[in-house]
Amino acid sequence: MTGGSSSRRRRAEERSSAAGTERNSRREAVGGMGAGPALAALLLAGSVLSATLLAPGRRAEPDLDEKRNVELKMDQALLLIHNELLGTSLTVYWKSDDCYQCTFQPLANVSHGGKPAKPSVAPVSVSTQHGSILQVNSTSEERAACRLEYKFGEFGNYSLLVQHASSGANKIACDIIVNENPVDSNLPVSIAFLVGLALIVAVSLLRLLLSLDDVNNWISKTIASRETDRLINSELGSPSRADPLSADYQPETRRSSANRLRCVDTFRGLALVLMVFVNYGGGKYWYFKHSSWNGLTVADLVFPWFVFIMGTSIFLSMTSILQRGCSKLKLLGKIVWRSFLLICIGVIIVNPNYCLGPLSWDKVRIPGVLQRLGVTYFVVAVLEFFFWKPVPDSCTLESSCFSLRDITSSWPQWLTILTLESIWLALTFFLPVPGCPTGYLGPGGIGDLGKYPHCTGGAAGYIDRLLLGDNHLYQHPSSTVLYHTEVAYDPEGVLGTINSIVMAFLGVQAGKILVYYKDQTKAILTRFAAWCCILGLISIVLTKVSANEGFIPINKNLWSISYVTTLSCFAFFILLILYPVVDVKGLWTGTPFFYPGMNSILVYVGHEVLENYFPFQWKLADEQSHKEHLIQNIVATALWVLIAYVLYKKKLFWKI
């Protein structure tokens, strides 16, 4: 009995030890992958619940609004204009302080008050997205009585009092008072961001904790002890049962791609997740929409980052393919075919017309995001293809931080890129545009005091209208609402493609740094930091650290060179952070952004095609609530992260 018990205990311990080894191996094999669905689900549930339970919704409109017959919409406040001037009618004009050199637009006409105690009151809705500039004119004399600037809050209730100043009968005073405080519409965003950040940090810390040997040993001993006792006391622990976990069993581990840089996929996924979120509406917040003209918003960051990291991937993949001995002719054919597919898919996506009847060829939009990517990919990939040189072994062993081998080896490419940029500058600033000043970079419409209403985009807009025609361009540019532009303008137009090529080539440069100085962390980080500083200084000079007053303002619609240098500066800075954290130290696996980054084409095309379908969109109880839109957009974005994770686990990738 004693011998049988000892034999049974020894067999049980061996089985427990093998099981523990399998668990550890599985944990090492999965690594950061296993946290993917849990983190995505937590991000989804935590962000939605926190935004739902803690953030204020839309404030109910007060009785005063109903009596005045003013229905407030999102990003609006109620303004009651009190005219206390006897015998003087008023005209109130308005403009946004974000509208550069815009003409005032009429807001309301207020008749004169009939009695001293009963002023005439006119209710109007005013925008709360940016600060407002109000000008009160005497209707009869058409002279400015007063002018004031004010930042209204969403769903707030305000009064503008126009009365005689106490200092003199001929002087007019204008004051704004708050009747009812606005809601804090930015609170849902703050809560969702903090919850998401906290969950990412928590999961990363948990992974770091589980990677410690002491913690792993404690878990293994605990599991082994319980498993041993269970097997001893169980009648199923028979020695005659076939034991798959014998001493000769070696657990299978997943082979990871040692050559694949995880930070690149993480960066691509970060840009893609932000792109999905802002394309779905971004909670209808103005800073998640594209800027009206000059300046930057969150939505303006994502596309150029995607272009940048595409350039990085071009060099990494081309180097890998050619080093494996792939035929150059076959590689060139792949470049041409992929570019063609990107352009075709892009044209299909931007011209859905699913419910509007047959597609009219007269109004097909030709430019678009994937079209821009296709052309950019073709030019940059062909450029690298014809001038590609093998990376010498001595280069990867070189330790000097002052080496410029990654730049000097690419002088033909740099010469080509500088030539392209010279063409952009020449066309932008010297091409004569009928009816417009040469070198005009403005939005047209009511901008520039309304002098050039049909000059939107200057040379860029003119070239697109000349080559493609008005009907084949984007009909609702971001400048329409604020600047009241009247002509079609496409932000993915012909001239801007030159600078997207420049941006992709800067991404190629990042890829060369990663390859030329492989395993030399200090050399890589030094070069990332240097590029970040150089591009940042160029941006400072071009913009004069001003949204509108620089030599070349930052402008997403134009894809100005300052826009490219600024966003490339940001991109190098992000790689400066991601590379050591993700690939060198392994402190973060890139979850959850890594998974969409591995299936970027599928996620982008899928989110565009299925945008209006459940579960990505549903009817909201209150269409004028930022909170409800934010919840919907977070859910939709998180679902695409989950889809990308599932496809990653099933090894399903859409490659073109």
Swiss-Prot record:
Its EC number(s): 2.3.1.78
Protein name, per record: Heparan-alpha-glucosaminide N-acetyltransferase
Function: Lysosomal acetyltransferase that acetylates the non-reducing terminal alpha-glucosamine residue of intralysosomal heparin or heparan sulfate, converting it into a substrate for luminal alpha-N-acetyl glucosaminidase.
Organism of derivation: Mus musculus (Mouse)
Additional notes on this entry: A signal sequence is predicted but has been shown not to be cleaved in the endoplasmic reticulum.
Annotated catalysed reactions: alpha-D-glucosaminyl-[heparan sulfate](n) + acetyl-CoA = N-acetyl-alpha-D-glucosaminyl-[heparan sulfate](n) + CoA + H(+)
Region (Lysosomal targeting region): 641-656
Tissue expression summary: Expressed in the retina.
Chain residue ranges for the region called Disordered: 1-31, 234-253
Record lineage: Eukaryota, Metazoa, Chordata, Craniata, Vertebrata
